[in-house]
């Protein structure tokens, strides 16, 4: 028994010595750049972990759906990726071989979705230029004429925007925001003059509308990462809003003090003028701080 144990220990020691002599390639440039050269290593590691991790059962059920007939898994928002294309290509190749048809050429194909997206972007740009020159529009928007009587989000939009558009179908402001999120901006007619239009970007919309859309995203796709990001952004928004309200109250208080002083001191002495200048400087400083917070 003792000899058998000594023999096992001896084998383990020889294996350890053998492994210690092996050469293992050091980490490459990409590994070093990601994990060692990043200023915020914790955030980078979190992103990489989120990218490669497997979904739990609840998250997978909310993001994907199973086709019992084809025994395939697809995204609930309808978007297809490389995996879906590879499965479809393999199915077509097997069917062609079974039917005796020649293989498709070239072997490497560009998914049809790439061409459709490019054509859609070109068509949208063309229609946008045409609408800008001709003055056409609908409900303050410049978008495809096929959308008359329907929502702002077109049929060629991704499933994410379609789902959000269905939730906020009765809110025109959020419909405009969704259109701007998908296309970068939206052209709107000014109320004072219907012949004039202005370009509205995403950052021009009220913050509470953007947070409302984000809250709905966390409800439709309740991933842990989405919820954490939303909670952090909402907390920052509440802090800035509270500080902004406090500064506005300070401005009103300073203004009331100036008015009171002007009523009780009609003769502008040197001291009163100095105090008034000081109060006005304080008001200007607070107004600049308000402008910085709003930006």
Curated annotation (Swiss-Prot):
Alphabetical GO CC annotations of the entry are: cytoplasm; DASH complex; mitotic spindle; spindle microtubule
GO terms for biological process? attachment of spindle microtubules to kinetochore; cell division; mitotic sister chromatid biorientation; positive regulation of attachment of spindle microtubules to kinetochore; positive regulation of microtubule polymerization; protein transport along microtubule to mitotic spindle pole body
Listed InterPro entries: Spc34 (IPR013966)
Domain of life of the organism in this record? Eukaryota
Q: Locate the coiled-coil region(s) and give their ranges.
A: 223-295
Where Phosphothreonine occurs along the chain?
199
- Location of the protein in the cell: Nucleus; Cytoplasm, Cytoskeleton, Spindle; Chromosome, Centromere, Kinetochore; Chromosome
Mind listing the UniProt keywords for this protein, alphabetically?
Cell cycle, Cell division, Centromere, Chromosome, Chromosome partition, Coiled coil, Cytoplasm, Cytoskeleton, Kinetochore, Microtubule, Mitosis, Nucleus, Phosphoprotein
Q: Which purpose does this protein serve, as stated in its record?
A: Component of the DASH complex that connects microtubules with kinetochores and couples microtubule depolymerisation to chromosome movement; it is involved in retrieving kinetochores to the spindle poles before their re-orientation on the spindle in early mitosis and allows microtubule depolymerization to pull chromosomes apart and resist detachment during anaphase.
Describe the family membership recorded for this protein in Swiss-Prot or TrEMBL.
Answer: Belongs to the DASH complex SPC34 family.
Subunit record text: Component of the DASH complex consisting of ASK1, DAD1, DAD2, DAD3, DAD4, DAM1, DUO1, HSK3, SPC19 and SPC34, with a stoichiometry of one copy of each subunit per complex. Multiple DASH complexes oligomerize to form a ring that encircles spindle microtubules and organizes the rod-like NDC80 complexes of the outer kinetochore. DASH complex oligomerization strengthens microtubule attachments. On cytoplasmic microtubules, DASH complexes appear to form patches instead of rings.
Its name, as the record gives it, is DASH complex subunit SPC34
